[in-house]
Amino acid sequence: MSVIKMTDLDLAGKRVFIRADLNVPVKDGKVTSDARIRASLPTIELALKQGAKVMVTSHLGRPTEGEYNEEFSLLPVVNYLKDKLSNPVRLVKDYLDGVDVAEGELVVLENVRFNKGEKKDDETLSKKYAALCDVFVMDAFGTAHRAQASTHGIGKFADVACAGPLLAAELDALGKALKEPARPMVAIVGGSKVSTKLTVLDSLSKIADQLIVGGGIANTFIAAQGHDVGKSLYEADLVDEAKRLLTTCNIPVPSDVRVATEFSETAPATLKSVNDVKADEQILDIGDASAQELAEILKNAKTILWNGPVGVFEFPNFRKGTEIVANAIADSEAFSIAGGGDTLAAIDLFGIADKISYISTGGGAFLEFVEGKVLPAVAMLEERAKK
């Protein structure tokens, strides 16, 4: 993947526009989870250190486009950045007709979704963004799969368009896991529905030596093997699709499971063979033998791609399967990459973040990259690198 990298450029004295992913949860005017801002800080600090005139922006939430709404302001992000940086930081609300930035100062441009035409990748808006800078830095992998004015359009018109360190690292890590993985390559796809992950399963079945399925997805595969899944979440209309995948790829389907008669945090768990699931029971986790089998597979892997838990890990009684799998990934010597909201929550819960080789910041973008789709922002950066 050939793109210009921000780290290859001299930014001294240049007006630098960084499109970061600062879309963080905010409650009562305070940032409640700072992971995305923390991930973006090194990029901002590097540009400031080089003596650039730095502007950074992002979307936050889903405001009505073209209207200012205090609820979706980047002000809480600005206050957070003021605490973390020694440089002056200020928020600018009206910037489309130009903004003055001093060297060593960080200007946060208000929520891009307050600008009409942002989501539609409007050309006039894109040109206005581009006129603000000498160098455009795309560093928001989480929105790279959307062609919008601040992620894609601006890059077509800016003098220079490059990938920020976060985006570059993300592309390198995903490339390493998917393009020429060290083998055996094991992929884990969890989640509730086969339908939402079908393309991912399809793509990975062609790359992975073993494809581990978990959650509601695994239930559809258990049904495909002719077992009764009781009241479990599964998709009857995709059983044939699961059967097809079972013939094209090595998919270890659970042999034992944990079940309950209701979907609740306090429901007691019963461990049993997949042959014995009753009509009034639902599968909420994989069993111990299945979890150990997966741990063994992961122990021998050289590359692991992890997207989704293998059970309802939010409920303590149905956490064990995901915990065993998570710890097996953490203990493995494989190159491991993890992505997706539930996966990140599991990594936090089991405290293994420092044992995963690379944690992806993108949800939808991560999945689309895995599916082999072209990410518009990345395609634009590749195009600009040729000029």
UniProtKB/Swiss-Prot annotation:
It is found in: Cytoplasm. The modification N6-acetyllysine is found at K84. Signal peptide: none annotated. It catalyses: (2R)-3-phosphoglycerate + ATP = (2R)-3-phospho-glyceroyl phosphate + ADP. One of its GO terms (molecular function) is guanosine tetraphosphate binding. SUPFAM superfamilies: Phosphoglycerate kinase (SSF53748). The keyword Transmembrane helix does not apply. Pathway: Carbohydrate degradation; glycolysis; pyruvate from D-glyceraldehyde 3-phosphate: step 2/5. The keyword Oxidoreductase does not apply. Belongs to the phosphoglycerate kinase family. Monomer. This is Phosphoglycerate kinase. It comes from Escherichia coli (strain K12). The gene is pgk.
